[in-house]
Amino acid sequence: MEVLENRSGDFISKEYIKQLKQSSNEAIATLVKENYNNSRTLIYILENLGYIPSTFNYQWIVDLLAYPNEDVRFWAVKNIGKLASDVFLDQLYKIATHDDSTKVRREAVSSIGRMRNNKSIPLMLEILSDPDPKIVCQAIRGLLVFKGDTIIDSTLKELVNHENEMVRSVIYKEYFAKNKNVRSALPHAETYSYLKNVVVNGDVRDVLKFVPDESIHLTFTSPPYYNARDYSIYPSYDAYLRFLEEVFCETYRVTKEGRFLIVNTSPVIVPRISRSHSSKRYPIPFDLHHFLVQMGWEFIDDIIWEKPEYSVKNRIGGFQQHRKPLAYKPNSITEYLMVYRKQTERLIDWNIHQYDSETINASKVKDGFETNNVWQICPKSDKIHSAVFPVELCQRIVEYYSYKGDLVFDPFGGSGTLGRTAKSLERSFFLTEKEPKYFEYMKTLQAKSNVFENGVTKFLSLEEFKNSVL
């Protein structure tokens, strides 16, 4: 239990504050007066004041509304709000519109809203024009208590065109989002058997035409580099981005509500065509991001994959020799894992609650998980594929973003590392791969792995897959 010492040498605890409240109407006011210059003590008193009876002398709290320390003001406002008296409406409104701390202003708006008093409605309607979207959202929250009132509803609906996306999102959810009463063809935790442990040789855009809506739980992929490999030649960078846009738009359709897409990309260098030309570096993850959020993917996290410097191409060698400014080119030891979630009005808890307790407990991540967003993992390659997913990378993604029994998808299957890893972690996989060389390579792994053994994994042409669906 935290205990503070006041100026008189007495110790202050929750119990002590409770005793003072009960012993005398003026006792707390005296304690505050004695410690007026000690903001830490004042905050402790305000935090632990608890229930405030109607007979309580609250003038000392009102006096603290102008205190220099914002945390003291915040807790003073919070305690004034407990009184739920419209006597304080004008005072709280003044704080909500004039205090120089967003934290204090937001709490003042919250206190006005918690009164649930018709007298507060005009004040909260005025606050909707505040330039700070956090304050506006707090006012919206207070006004939604009166949802159904014609004036309030019409005023709030107009905010769907508000400049701030946070405000627009709140209003859209409350007034314009379609109610998802129509149930999906399958329960959230389930998927179609003909998609489980299947590898299809074909263009992912053609394959996904035969995949039902909301059938994938997790997508993790590394798109082909723009014109940096012989198997990925595009007429222009714009054409490359449009190709990825098509792929991830269809991926969005087949992804279950509120589930994740993780895209592994990095800026790529296209070599110069001659000594009289410079090489070109394309910021793929940053350019792709725009398309993803536009189609409805919600950005959640950026994870940095850090590789050992010895494993990457040496770009700094020339500079190490001449040290001339402007020619500095550091070695690129990072790639991005951009984490997105399919847009939904539901919280993550809803997704979790779609599973039974046995699955939830069995899927819990074990000790030793990564706690920050910089992951140090060595890259992998082999004689067939020069850019292979490290197993450790796949393990983390699959364990952190899916449950046992889920269907994990990679639209650019490559050598099939994600599929093998998913299966070893008791998930199912669905892979597509356009290049026959890599498709055949995955088939050869049947003899080396009990994951891709006969009877477990189906290797299908596009036509065979189409027939299995139809």
Question: Each PLM stretch: what is its role?
Answer:
Residues 3-22, 30-33, 40-55, 60-66, ...:
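Structural detector for internal amphipathic alpha-helices that build alpha-solenoid repeat scaffolds
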Residues 69, 100-101, 107, 132-134, ...:
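Core catalytic lobe of class I
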Residues 93, 157, 172, 293, ...:
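Class I S-adenosyl-L-methionine
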Residues 141, 165-195, 199:
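Basic, amphipathic N-terminal segments that precede the first structured/catalytic domain
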Residues 144-148, 165-172, 176, 284-288, ...:
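Class I S-adenosyl-L-methionine-dependent methyltransferase module
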Residues 154-164:
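TPR/TPR-like (Sel1-like) alpha-helical repeat modules
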Residues 183-207, 448-470:
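S-adenosyl-L-methionine
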